[in-house]
Structures are given as C-alpha cells and as structure tokens.
From Swiss-Prot:
Subunit structure of this chain's protein: Monomer. Associates with the 60S ribosomal subunit.
An example molecular function term from Gene Ontology annotations: ribosomal large subunit binding
Pfam families: eIF-6 (PF01912)
One Gene Ontology term from the biological process aspect of the record: assembly of large subunit precursor of preribosome
Top-level taxon of the source organism: Eukaryota
Keywords per UniProt: Cytoplasm, Initiation factor, Nucleus, Protein biosynthesis, Ribosome biogenesis
Designated name of the protein: Eukaryotic translation initiation factor 6
Protein family membership: Belongs to the eIF-6 family.
CDD domains: IF6
Keyword Ribosomal protein: no
Gene field: eIF6
Role description: Binds to the 60S ribosomal subunit and prevents its association with the 40S ribosomal subunit to form the 80S initiation complex in the cytoplasm. May also be involved in ribosome biogenesis.
Length: 245
C-alpha cells in the first residue's frame, strides 16, 4: 500500500522522513496529522521517532539507514545522537560519520543488502557503510547523476530510479542490486524520487501530489500489494536471530 501525506503543505515528504524495516524517523515540528499518519500505519510494528539532526528537520536528506543501522552526519549533536540511541531498537547500530558530502541521504541509496553511493564518497565512509549497514557497496551514477540517494529509492523487494535512466542501465543496476527496477516519477512528474517518497518492504508514503498512475507503479515494483508487516517482521526476527547465533 502507498499512502499520500504532506509535511506542512510540502509534498517532499522524503526530505523530512526516514523509513526502514525496523524504525521510522519523522522530523520534529511537522503537523500532528503528518506524524499520526505514520504512527497509525507503523506504530504496532516499528518505533516511529521524532528526531532532528544538527538542529535541522531535513532528516531524510541528512541520514541513511536500513534495518541494521543508521548513519548520521557530523553535524548531529551529542543530545540528538543519545535521543536516537534511546529510541531505536538495540540491534540498530547508530554511527556519526565525518564525510565532506554530509547530506548522506542524497549521496547513498540502500536497502538491507546493497548500497549505491556517490562516486566521490570518501573511502573511509564506504567502509563505514559496509560495516554499520552490513551491505555491499557500489560506486554508481543514476542517469549520469552522482546524487544516487536522490534519484534512486530501494527496498528489498524492488527499486525505482530516475525516469531518464536507460534500459541498459536499469538492467545493469537490477542485476547488481538483485531486485527488479523501474524508471519512474513521484509527485506528478518529479524526478527527485527520494524527496517525494519513502518505502520499506510492506508500505510506502508518497507526497500528496502523487498521481494514481505513479502510485500503481510504486505498489507494483515494490510489491506492496502482497506485503504484510506481520510476515515481514517475522522474517526479519528470524534473520536477526540467525545473525546473532
């Protein structure tokens, strides 16, 4: 299922939100309606946490995470870091990264297994991504754009990339990521996919301007119509237990 929401009359909901299979971050200061939309859908399954990073609300663009971890920029204060550590599941590793390209959400796209990163990302940051998020890392561009985190959205079920991504590039990326990919838009034609939507393995939230056609493409490629949180979390728990044993 893909649900339409707005953050204070802004359709770029992916700028103010970070959604994974084990937690959801929502910027402090949004309307209560925005927060409650996430709480209503996710509250029984994963924690929905109010958070800011470096005093900024654009947490979706500044952070990157998956079920294993969360990377935050160097501008994150000690208090903000402590709040995240107190609020997220113990199994989620939180790490503050010293990286020149500090809008981590713009330069990294990931699911629970692989990450696409900006070609100029520090080597040390690449190693941190692999270690904390437990993913295989690939330096990549999307439709000749280095901001892979802005122009690609991934889950473990599928992915969506910039509408100008060639078929050949889609095929290469798909085999690299091992998930089906589609080129598409959100918010009535916006190419900046990650600004307009967030997705995990059973649910997506999109900007209010997103058309019915865009929603049906999103639900199809991310396999949201057949996904149930209960089955997903059961699988995740089994995987986590397996990891720990």
């Amino acid at each position: 299922m893909a649900l339409r929401v707005q953050f204070e009359n802004n359709d770029d909901i992916g700028v103010f939100t970070k959604l994974t299979n084990t937690y959801c971050l929502v910027a402090i200061g949004g309307s209560e309606t925005f927060y409650s939309a996430f709480e209503a859908e996710l509250g029984d399954t994963i924690p929905v946490v109010h958070a800011n990073v470096g005093g900024c609300r654009i947490i979706g663009r500044l952070t990157v995470g998956n079920r294993n971890g969360l990377l935050v920029p160097n501008s994150t204060t000690d208090e903000e870091l402590q709040h995240l550590r107190n609020s997220l599941p113990d199994a989620v590793k939180i790490y503050r990264v010293e990286e020149r390209l500090s809008a981590l959400g713009n330069v990294i796209a990931c699911n629970d297994y692989v990450a696409l990163v900006h070609p100029d990302l520090d080597k040390e940051t690449e190693e941190i991504i692999a270690d904390v998020l437990k993913v295989e890392v690939f330096r990549q561009t999307i439709a000749d754009n280095s901001l892979v985190g802005s122009y690609a959205v991934l889950s473990n079920q599928g992915g969506m990339v910039h509408p100008k991504t060639s078929i050949q590039d889609q095929d290469e990326l798909s085999s690299l990521l091992q998930v089906p990919l589609v080129a598409g838009t959100v918010n009535r034609g916006s190419e900046v996919l990650a600004a307009g939507m967030v997705v995990n393995d059973w649910l997506s939230f999109v900007g209010m301007n997103t058309t019915a056609t865009e929603i049906s493409v999103i639900e199809s490629v991310f396999k949201l119509n057949q996904a149930q949180p209960a089955t997903v979390t059961t699988k995740l728990r089994a995987a986590l237990i397996e990891d720990m044993s």
